[in-house]
């Protein structure tokens, strides 16, 4: 039967008997939960948003509870718990590898992790106050890579496509590909541990002095500042083989032989160095985290990005030739490399690319749930992910209550509070604030799924002001100066500003900005003239579309600068966290639903935008 979510979020089916599947990513980075009802996504959220620890590992207790509460389901109504790991996968390969190499660390850490997976029925049962035997009867393990593949394929708009996942590794696999035909997803090929493009990127990220889990984004942002003059040296770290395969030169890496400390406990995941002293002998001494970034570090980042792209396109070109498909669904942590994604259509035979917003391990909960749904006889596909808003929302009453609780704090900072009755006039007023050079925290509707803020938990600013990048990086986000900002653009105006760009509501592809427009939108133009765009349509996010439309009416520019609503923490989830972040930083305006907090204006004049766009 057809499924719809009632205003409470409660899912109802015309046929009466609903199938409720909960997907879970646990004991890995970016733990999360997702809920499907009769094959349609109802809710999805990452545990880091509740726990306030980036990439949190462990078990997604709060995410799981929220998904069920949102849909009005009791834990006993869950038909399947789908977990995106399979401790039994590739056991012979693992045993052979352990016998041959006797590694000290990594694999032993993973073995401990697998023992946690075995106790998962008890953990789920105690989390939801269910009988463990009941959970055990309803638990399905879905291997890590098939979960990645399913997370992209089954929510894509394609009936037929090639599907590929590239990441660090999970369940002993680092790369896999296959094909989607309707409800059927087949895996054709896998590349196994210890060979991994994700691990190559991680090793050089660590070498460049970015030690935190998830810091690869920083290196991708740094790369356009340098020339890839070390590419030949980095090519010695791996060999590209026939049929899309590749091999690392393991003498440069330590992840396979042990000695790498990995923790996947109840907190931020940590990874010790995965490279050996031989890498420093090849490239020179590593950068310490407290040392300044120098020209040769920029060149190394550029070289890594170039070699990663060559290797990824080596895989993808083989996938395209063997599947003969013009469409690609891409997943895995490496699918978050938006710079490479923007070149896929130019450097492979693929014409259409789909990446869902939680392409990393966070999305495997979604994938495991869809894999289980589509393993059912007669299951049909009638869901396409067109937006990312699958998390919690808060009504104006809840927002008002939080504002009352914090009234003393914002009075101290000379902030005024107003509640608007008309959303359209509030959007027009907000657009005028942006055009006047003010930085706006924008909090609307359901929170985004995945690691990008896409207009519901965003910090917004005027893209015409060249100084805006430094203002936000240094005054609000407190992060590295070289990090770029993204343009959110009205879908219907895309070709005016970008060269060869595709529609992408999830901000996962970087494209060149037209040379004549770069001076018009300097704050969202990266050093190489590119922008990681988000297309905004009236259908997928009507409120955000109306705001950008209002900004366009004032300025002639159909774009706002969009960055995630956070300051060295996960993206804000609740109105209280949004108000805290607003008060802690130097944002000028906060719009939550139809409530506005506004700082008293400083008397210093705002610099003028670089250029106004002529229509």
For the regions a protein language model found, what residue spans apply to each?
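Phosphate/ATP-binding catalytic cores across multiple sugar-kinase/actin-like superfamilies
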Residues: 302-328
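N-terminal cofactor/phosphate-binding cores enriched in small/glycine residues
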Residues: 20-91
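Feature for intrinsically disordered/low-complexity regulatory segments and propeptides
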Residues: 115-117
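Flexible beta->alpha loop and helix N-cap segments adjacent to enzyme active/binding sites
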Residues: 27-46, 51-54, 94-97, 102-106, ...
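Nucleotide/phosphate-binding catalytic cleft detector across ATP-hydrolyzing
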Residues: 12-14, 149
